[in-house]
């Protein structure tokens, strides 16, 4: 019952009509009344009040009790309340009722009910008829009408048992509830009874305590003094009533008698030990000494004992005289108490067991004494000096346990100690072995495990606990340091001599006993172990002091975990050194890894063949690199390595490419650390080489990479055919390449900073936040040549970045691209430019003395041509031999122009009239033919200049003029226009033609001329009469045309033509004969040729409307034009120039895309027209 019942015993529930229902059971509080029950009478002093504690308390307070008393201890503390018991019983009843209903429902029904023939009241109930009695009271069914089937009886039995069980339970609950009505008063009485019994027990305990105290003080009781005896002794010095026996003392022995008896005793001892008891003497006592009437048995390193005899009878016992220990430290003499104890004990053993028992007893006693001396010294060491609080000494009967390094942190879980005890000397089967007596035995337990075959020397002659501990600790230190050394030395870093590791062991241990590990350069971590404390410490290096030593000391197993901590110490030192190392401004150490740890493991463990050691990675980045690239230094026992890696896509996802760098730890050493310079060189070369690999792979170009040199230079070899593919000539033939088979790319590292970049780096970084310039790399490409003799015209330096070595016969191309940009596109462009240069140089070489090269570089080629050709006069049809020589003209080819190759001619050059065609040819496959073309066409163009000059006088009289139209480099048209009543016009085409391997100029009337076949035409008549039918110096008439040599014949031929046509100037035209001339049917040209021909004819048709216009060359006016003619000429010239440019572009595209079709079309055109020349400018 809870305490609330005691405190509110006089109260009732505030609402008696209300009751709480728990699991269907109504719970009502039971009021505990304090009124006396009926029939109870009062006592002698008045009525009896049951449980009225409140009145009693008020009476005590009224009596003047000022101090409150302690509350009585209630027996109902921690007792289950009645309400909980009733609620649990209600829950139990409810659950049992549910189980009963389910069990009854699962039982089978009676057969009569299933058949519809139920009897008795069951049937009546089903049919709705209830037997009623008097006044409507239902009648009880008679026994004959009850359902007596076995199923129903079984169900009724179950219900009856259930009701009986619950009834018994609730009856008990009712009894408890009824009793609980007076539980408050009864509980208080019990509390009071318990309290009084406890007080009574205190009286009994006090009594017995006094009795025990009296018994325990008996030793302190002082007897009453004997004053009478004391007075007599102090007065007279004797007591007369004490008895005196009157014995006479024996006379003392003389010296002779003493020597005699001693001699007799020695003789008897010799006889007894030699003859009678020699076999019973223990083996350690076989060597003994007899002197002074005694025999002295000695056990080396243990004790000496003196024995004697008192009788000549050999069966009598020996007697103990003296016992001395002969080990040190030991007491010089025994105390009286110890001597008396040993003497009594030894004499008893000699009487019962003889000499063998005496030896065993004294031997065991000595061993125990030695163990005690070891224990005494151990306790003294643990309290003084360096051993204070480092030892824990424990005596175990005759054994001694000494735990050392008790305060060391790494030995708390696995303690180490030595155990010194006595070995029985018995064999394995428990039998005594006389040859092996008991002895001291030492056992060493290291880290909680016994060390077998430790072979620790134990000096029992000179006992020194400190020396013994030092010997054991020396073995332990050697074990720890050797285990750490073996663990480290087996790793690849030290096995491959990449780091220094040494072990020094001294016995006994001292500070020289240490493990020395190289951290970086001359820096070493010297690990030692304190022999007294057992703690690890680092010597000679304050940075490696308390922190890292404590970390090792807290390890549970230093043997396996200390190597990892030492490696972490090296990582820390390397990281600290790298962060404090002076570095360029563009280098920085990243605070965290730019890629996940799994990717870093993939890189570091790519070189791990068998084991994967823990590692530490330091990441660096150069601000002049692309963000995807970074450098990494991995430190591990597998080896320190430097890596260059490229992140894939977004930084922080994965590593795409990584490469190991050949950087050694010595590169980090001061004062001149080459780390960052080597790192920059290695990483820059790798980035550009990898970028070039990607480009080569994408373009399906074969390549190979050679092994990198120690200085970081890398080499890639590609096929020159891939950089310079063989291109067919316009005639369809394929020219052999001039370059060697391979092109070697050498990556030389970062390019030196330019002065502008240096000045920018020195600027104030706080002024403007600038984006750092990209790092540039130096790359050299070596292109060999197959025939060095062809390149004798080249100088050593062709350009700022292009060199030619005549002795070795190769070109050296130097590049300085941005880091990570690669050079494959630049290399291809530069090699193609070099190929273009080689073609021109080859062409210049083939021309020999006809062309004089002045400057040959990759950007510009300057040469002159024209020396040695004779000059002819147009007024004289025949050239004057031995006349003035023509001057040389200079040509400048700008190979580095923005629009391609630019042809620059000096003022007055005859070829200025075809400058547009020259520039177009220079940017096509005909570039290498330009030098030959200049030489081949120079006589023609100089003759054309003289032709223009000869018509100046005729033009001044308005009698006629002439001008030249250039349709291509090898096709031009001369138009002669004469004045008169009707405009008279003739056009002559000049084209080269190959006959028997010789190139000649062929001149004929243009096919577009309508009077080409008109025999009555005045131009046909005079040309046929004075030109087509004659031959001269270097030219020959062909009936309707003429051919001339390119060098000596074209000038005289043009002079003859010019003289014939000028003769018609100023003459009236002949009368026109109306004859219809049937034009020959021309073959249908190819559609492409028709389009080109239409474009070419269009400007000619426009020119025919006004034959007296100025010269056809834009910007050239050799004659004084009439008013209005100059503007008309300029407009027409610009229109012709635009048409020619469009025509050139169309021709070039047509030639590049449909080269074969163009060749076939040219062949068909040549077959249809025999007058079409074949142009070969070589």
Curated annotation (Swiss-Prot):
Region Disordered, as annotated, extends over: 1-50, 1064-1178
Question: In terms of one coarse class, where is the protein primarily found?
Answer: nucleus
Which keywords label this protein? Activator, Nucleus, Transcription, Transcription regulation
Segments of skewed composition (Polar residues): 1-12
List where Low complexity composition bias occurs: 1074-1112, 1119-1164
Q: Which GO cellular component does the record give, naming just one?
A: mediator complex
Query: Quick one: a GO biological-process term for this protein?
Result: regulation of transcription by RNA polymerase II
Q: What's an example of a GO molecular-function annotation for this chain?
A: transcription coregulator activity
Where located? Nucleus
Q: What is its biological role? A: Component of the Mediator complex, a coactivator involved in the regulated transcription of nearly all RNA polymerase II-dependent genes. Mediator functions as a bridge to convey information from gene-specific regulatory proteins to the basal RNA polymerase II transcription machinery. Mediator is recruited to promoters by direct interactions with regulatory proteins and serves as a scaffold for the assembly of a functional preinitiation complex with RNA polymerase II and the general transcription factors.
Q: How does it assemble?
A: Component of the Mediator complex.
Similarity field: Belongs to the Mediator complex subunit 14 family.
Designated name of the protein: Mediator of RNA polymerase II transcription subunit 14
Look up and give the organism this protein is from.
Answer: Chaetomium globosum (strain ATCC 6205 / CBS 148.51 / DSM 1962 / NBRC 6347 / NRRL 1970)
Lineage of producing organism: Eukaryota, Fungi, Dikarya, Ascomycota, Pezizomycotina
């Amino acid at each position: 019952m809870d305490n609330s019942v005691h405190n509110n015993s006089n109260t009732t529930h505030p609402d008696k009509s209300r009751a709480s229902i728990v699991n269907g059971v109504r719970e009502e509080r039971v009021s505990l009344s304090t009124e006396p029950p009926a029939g109870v009478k009062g006592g002698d002093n008045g009525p009896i009040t049951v449980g009225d504690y409140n009145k009693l308390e008020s009476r005590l307070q009224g009596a003047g009790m000022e101090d409150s008393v302690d509350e009585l201890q209630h027996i109902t503390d921690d007792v289950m309340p009645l309400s909980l018991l009733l609620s649990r019983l209600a829950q139990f009843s409810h659950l049992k009722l549910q189980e009963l209903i389910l069990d009854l429902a699962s039982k089978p029904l009676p057969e009569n009910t299933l058949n519809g023939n139920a009897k008795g009241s069951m049937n009546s109930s089903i049919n709705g008829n209830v037997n009623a009695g008097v006044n409507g009271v239902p009648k009880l069914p008679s026994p004959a009408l009850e359902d007596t089937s076995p199923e129903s009886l079984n169900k009724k039995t179950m219900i009856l048992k259930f009701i009986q069980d619950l009834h018994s339970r609730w009856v008990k609950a009712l009894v408890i509830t009824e009793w609980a009505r007076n539980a408050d008063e009864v509980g208080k009485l019990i509390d009071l009874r318990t309290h009084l019994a406890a007080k009574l027990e205190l009286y009994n305990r006090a009594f017995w305590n006094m009795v025990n105290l009296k018994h325990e003080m008996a030793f302190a009781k002082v007897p009453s003094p004997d004053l009478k005896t004391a007075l007599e002794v102090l007065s007279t010095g004797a007591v007369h009533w004490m008895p005196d026996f009157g014995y006479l003392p024996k006379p003392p022995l003389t010296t002779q008698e003493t020597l005699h008896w001693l001699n007799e005793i020695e003789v008897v001892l010799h006889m007894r030990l030699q003859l009678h008891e020699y076999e019973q003497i223990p083996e350690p006592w076989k060597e003994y000494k007899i002197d002074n009437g005694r025999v002295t048995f000695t056990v080396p390193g243990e004790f000496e004992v003196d024995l004697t005899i008192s009788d000549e009878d050999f069966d009598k016992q020996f007697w103990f005289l003296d016992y001395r220990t002969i080990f040190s430290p030991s007491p010089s003499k025994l105390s009286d108490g110890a001597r008396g104890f040993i003497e009594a004990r030894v004499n008893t053993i000699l009487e019962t067991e003889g000499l063998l028992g005496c030896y065993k007893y004294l031997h065991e006693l000595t061993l125990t004494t030695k163990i005690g001396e070891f224990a005494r010294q151990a306790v003294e060491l643990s309290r003084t000096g360096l051993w204070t609080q480092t030892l824990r000494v424990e005596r175990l009967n005759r054994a001694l346990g000494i735990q050392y390094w008790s305060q060391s942190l790494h030995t708390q879980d696995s303690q180490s100690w030595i155990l010194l005890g006595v070995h029985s000397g018995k064999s394995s089967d428990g039998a005594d072995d006389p040859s092996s007596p008991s002895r001291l035995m030492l056992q060493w337990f290291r880290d909680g495990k016994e060390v077998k075959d430790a072979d620790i020397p134990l000096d029992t002659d000179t006992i020194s606990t400190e020396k013994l501990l030092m010997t054991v600790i020396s073995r332990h230190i050697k074990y720890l340091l050797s285990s750490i050394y073996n663990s480290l030395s087996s790793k690849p870093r030290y096995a491959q001599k990449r780091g220094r590791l040494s072990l020094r062991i001294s016995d006994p241990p001292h500070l020289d006993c240490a493990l020395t590990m190289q951290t970086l350069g001359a820096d070493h971590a010297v690990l030692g172990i304190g022999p007294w404390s057992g703690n690890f410490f680092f010597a000679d290096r304050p940075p490696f002091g308390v922190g890292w030593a404590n970390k090792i000391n807290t390890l549970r197993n230093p043997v396996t975990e200390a190597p990892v901590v030492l490696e972490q110490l090296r990582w820390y030192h390397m990281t600290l050194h790298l962060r404090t190392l002076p570095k360029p401004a563009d280098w920085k150490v990243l605070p965290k890894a730019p890629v996940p740890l799994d990717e870093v493991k993939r890189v570091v463990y790519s070189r791990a063949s068998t084991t994967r050691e823990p590692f530490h990675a330091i990441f660096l980045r150069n601000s002049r690199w692309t963000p995807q690239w970074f450098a990494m230094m991995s430190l591990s026992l597998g080896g320190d390595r430097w890596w260059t890696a490229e992140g894939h896509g977004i930084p922080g996802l994965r590593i795409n490419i990584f490469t190991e760098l050949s950087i050694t730890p010595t590169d980090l050493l001061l004062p001149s650390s080459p780390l960052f310079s080597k790192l920059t060189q290695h990483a820059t070369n790798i980035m550009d080489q990898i970028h070039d690999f990607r480009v080569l792979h994408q373009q399906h170009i074969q390549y190979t990479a050679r092994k990198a040199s120690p200085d970081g230079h890398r080499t890639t070899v590609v096929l020159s055919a891939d950089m310079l593919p063989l291109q067919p000539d316009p005639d369809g033939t394929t020219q052999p390449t001039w370059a060697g088979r391979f092109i070697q790319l050498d990556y030389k590292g970062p390019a030196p900073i330019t002065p502008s970049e240096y000045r920018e780096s020195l600027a104030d970084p706080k002024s403007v936040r600038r984006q750092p310039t990209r790092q540039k790399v130096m790359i050299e490409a070596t292109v060999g040549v197959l025939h060095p003799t062809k390149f004798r015209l080249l100088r050593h330096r062709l350009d700022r970045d292009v060199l030619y070595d005549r002795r070795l016969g190769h070109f050296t191309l130097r590049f300085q691209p941005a880091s990570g940009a690669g050079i494959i596109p630049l290399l291809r462009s530069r090699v193609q430019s070099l190929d273009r240069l080689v073609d021109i140089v080859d062409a210049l070489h083939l021309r020999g003395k006809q062309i004089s090269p002045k400057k040959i570089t990759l950007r510009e080629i300057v040469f002159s041509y024209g020396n040695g050709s004779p000059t002819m006069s147009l007024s004289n049809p025949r050239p004057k031999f031995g006349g003035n020589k023509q001057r040389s003209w200079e040509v400048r080819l700008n190979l580095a122009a923005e629009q391609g190759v630019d042809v620059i001619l000096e003022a007055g050059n005859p070829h200025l009239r075809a400058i547009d065609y020259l520039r177009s040819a220079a940017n096509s496959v005909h570039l290498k033919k330009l030098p030959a073309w200049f030489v081949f066409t120079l006589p023609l163009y100089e003759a054309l200049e003289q032709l223009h000059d000869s018509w100046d006088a005729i033009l001044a009289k308005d009698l006629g003029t002439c001008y030249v139209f250039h349709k291509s480099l090898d096709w031009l048209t001369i138009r002669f226009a004469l004045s008169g009543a009707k405009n008279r016009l003739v056009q002559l085409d000049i084209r080269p033609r190959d006959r028997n391997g010789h190139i000649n100029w062929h001149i004929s009337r243009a096919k577009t001329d309508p009077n080409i076949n008109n025999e009555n035409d005045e131009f046909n008549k005079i040309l046929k009469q004075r030109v087509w039918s004659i031959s001269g110096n270097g030219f020959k008439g062909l009936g309707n045309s003429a051919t001339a040599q390119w060098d000596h014949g074209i000038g005289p031929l043009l002079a003859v033509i010019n003289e014939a046509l000028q003769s018609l100037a100023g003459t009236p035209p002949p009368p026109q004969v109306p004859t219809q001339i049937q034009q020959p049917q021309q073959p249908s040209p190819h559609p492409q040729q028709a389009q080109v021909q239409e474009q070419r004819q269009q400007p000619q048709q426009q020119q025919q409307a006004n034959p007296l216009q100025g010269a056809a060359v834009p910007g050239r006016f050799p004659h004084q034009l009439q008013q209005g003619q100059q503007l008309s000429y300029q407009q027409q010239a610009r229109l012709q120039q635009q048409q020619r440019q469009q025509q050139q572009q169309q021709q070039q595209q047509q030639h590049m895309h449909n080269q074969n079709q163009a060749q076939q079309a040219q062949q068909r055109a040549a077959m249809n027209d025999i007058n079409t020349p074949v142009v070969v400018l070589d």
